[in-house]
A protein has these predicted regions:
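N-terminal module-boundary/linker segments of secreted carbohydrate-active enzymes
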Residues: 22-56, 60
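Generic secondary-structure transition motif, activating predominantly at the C-termini of alpha-helices
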Residues: 9-12, 62-67
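Substrate-binding cleft and catalytic face of glycoside hydrolase catalytic domains
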Residues: 28-33, 65-160
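Bacterial Sec-dependent N-terminal signal peptides
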Residues: 1-22
Length: 160
């Protein structure tokens, strides 16, 4: 029975290949037709807990005038405050190239959540915000915004 199911599966897959291979797609672009405004393109600075997120050369390559032409930088608000400083230089360099910087937390700190685990000193992505902690969480986000501003790396947009 198992062999028969396997044969049927393989037959079904190989039978689709000629059909899929024969299909063609056509795309037409009309620059005069506009559906939405695109503010720009960018990249995300990932985990920065061990070292600075980007070197200046990397920022120049991505956000600089002779680079990729990015104009938006997204960074993660690390739930561990001791890691906030790792994004400062990259934000300063990107902003020097005119980038818009927006920051978003992937998860609130462990102390503001219920049903969560703590891993490596950070919150896991499990659980959810404790409704009793919403005001404290908002103050924590404001503290982050102020920290970055005090470092000369002001955040343009904070997304939750």
């Amino acid at each position: 029975m198992k062999r028969m199911i396997t044969l049927l599966y393989v037959t079904a897959l190989t039978g689709c290949i000629p059909l899929c291979a024969q299909r063609t797609a056509s795309v037409s672009l009309d620059p005069e037709t506009k559906f939405q405004k695109i503010d720009g393109f960018g990249g995300c600075g990932m985990n920065g807990q061990w070292a600075d997120v980007y070197t200046q050369e990397q920022v120049d390559l991505l956000w600089g005038p002779d680079g990729m032409g990015y104009n938006i930088m997204r960074i993660r608000i690390n739930p561990d405050e001791s890691n906030w400083k790792s994004y400062v230089n990259a934000v300063k360099w990107a902003k020097a190239h005119g980038a818009t910087v927006f920051a978003s937390p992937w998860t609130p700190p462990y102390r503001f959540k219920v049903g969560a685990e703590q891993t490596w000193g950070e919150s896991s992505n499990h659980g959810h915000i404790n409704t009793d902690s919403i005001e404290s969480y908002a103050k924590w986000l404001e503290r982050y915004r102020q920290f970055m501003e005090d470092q000369g790396a002001a955040i343009d947009i904070l997304s939750v």
